Amino acid sequence: MGPGWRAPSAALVGGSVALFGALRRAALALPRPAAVRSRPGRVWRWRNLLVSFAHSVLAGLWALFSLWQSPELLSDIQDGYSVSGHLLVCFSSGYFIHDSLDIIFNQQSRSSWEYLVHHAMAISAFVSLIITGRFLVAAMLLLLVEVSNIFLTIRMLLKMSNVPSPALYEANKYVNLVMYFAFRLAPQVYLTWYFVRYVEVQGQGAFLMANLLLLDAMILMYFSRLLRSDFFPSLRKGSVGRDVDGEKFLID
């Protein structure tokens, strides 16, 4: 991918930011559960999660379809290229920029600082991919995580809305766990192994390796929280009486 792609890519990222801004405004008009309406602190989080859900559905299925359509890309993680994958990276870059701005402008930085760290890592990594045209397939593999995020976001929306159907939450709990292994942990483990074994640790390779290792630590931390919350609640510490208002990440 030559330099001629850079200006169109910037326009695509900007268009994605605008698209998610429009989705955010549309989410304001959607009906909200009584449990959300009665707690002002939850209104922003509910709307933010709806936009996040839209990104997860679109990006997760997009990544899955792109890799299914072109499986040969998996044999060239460093230099493989597809137009679909390039558009996907621009699309998700726009979402991460939009979500970061949404968090900051709505004064949620303190409660959602982990997302800001994650988004800064993702944006910087994706920009480097767009500029160099390398490791695009690695980004596509990482974006499979959005399939897992579909069910993780459903989990959080169910908790916030106090849905009176424990069976629905229980079913999603187990599906969420399976998806976490299949689309979050498995691609992450494979990419970490690949980078350690095959990628030269200098320049862009070193930068992406550092991002990947930090992401490994974050994913394991979130997995620990998920297990404690949904499967071993007796092991939770300091969560009694904790309010979820404004909290964007999985902490309860």
From Swiss-Prot:
Residues 69-84, 196-202 are cytoplasmic. One of its GO terms (cellular component) is plasma membrane. The keyword Signal applies. It holds the Pfam family TRAM_LAG1_CLN8. Residues 1-29 form the signal peptide. Residues 41-235 form the TLC domain. GO terms for biological process: membrane assembly; phospholipid homeostasis; plasma membrane organization; regulation of membrane lipid distribution. It is a multi-pass membrane protein. Interacts with CACNA1C in vitro; however the relevance of the interaction in vivo is unclear. It is found in: Cell membrane. Residues 125-145 dip into the membrane without crossing it. PROSITE patterns: TLC (PS50922). The keyword Membrane applies. Residues 30-47, 106-124, 146-174, 224-252 are extracellular. Regulates the composition and fluidity of the plasma membrane. Inhibits the incorporation of membrane-fluidizing phospholipids containing omega-3 long-chain polyunsaturated fatty acids (LCPUFA) and thereby promotes membrane rigidity. Does not appear to have any effect on LCPUFA synthesis. It comes from Gallus gallus (Chicken). Keywords: Cell membrane, Membrane, Signal, Transmembrane, Transmembrane helix. The chain crosses the membrane at residues 48-68, 85-105, 175-195, 203-223. This is TLC domain-containing protein 1. Disulfide bonds: none annotated.
